[in-house]
């Protein structure tokens, strides 16, 4: 069943294909609470819209609206979470992020921890209902 807050497989597949292409993936870095800007990015043909929750003005409710706009426009919602805390990673994925960007990772141990936080058990530590 389709949920308007979950990224469409087309937008995620388009983003992954662009990442692996010679051109690379193109998308704006967005510090906004206005879904219209995210929708415009999709209609402009970008591969992703990077939604900044580290420095941006948004809440989880606002993030859900931004993600919904990305899905309407067919652009992959990539969410930059603050400092890679497990709760932010979990909630960003729960509200429909197609990918997460984790800032300020300095060690391999930190990288392993955030990968684990993004994956469900038994592979990772992300919680389930």
Regions found by a protein language model. Give the residues of each.
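Short, ordered loop/turn segments at secondary-structure junctions
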Residues: 53-56, 82-83, 105-107
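Glycine-rich, proline-tolerant flexible connector loops at the mouths of alpha/beta enzymes
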Residues: 37-65
């Amino acid at each position: 069943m389709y949920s308007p807050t979950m990224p469409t497989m087309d937008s995620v597949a388009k983003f992954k294909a662009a990442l692996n292409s010679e051109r690379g993936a193109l998308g704006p870095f967005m510090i906004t609470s206005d879904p219209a800007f995210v929708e415009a990015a999709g209609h402009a043909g970008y591969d992703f819209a990077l939604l900044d929750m580290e420095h941006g003005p948004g809440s989880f409710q606002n993030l859900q609206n931004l993600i919904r706009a990305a899905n309407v426009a067919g652009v992959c919602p990539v969410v930059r979470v603050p400092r890679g805390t497990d709760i932010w990673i979990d909630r960003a994925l729960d509200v429909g992020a197609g990918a997460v960007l984790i800032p300020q990772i300095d060690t391999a141990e930190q990288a392993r921890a955030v990968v684990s936080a993004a994956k469900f058990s038994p592979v990772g530590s992300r919680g389930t209902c």
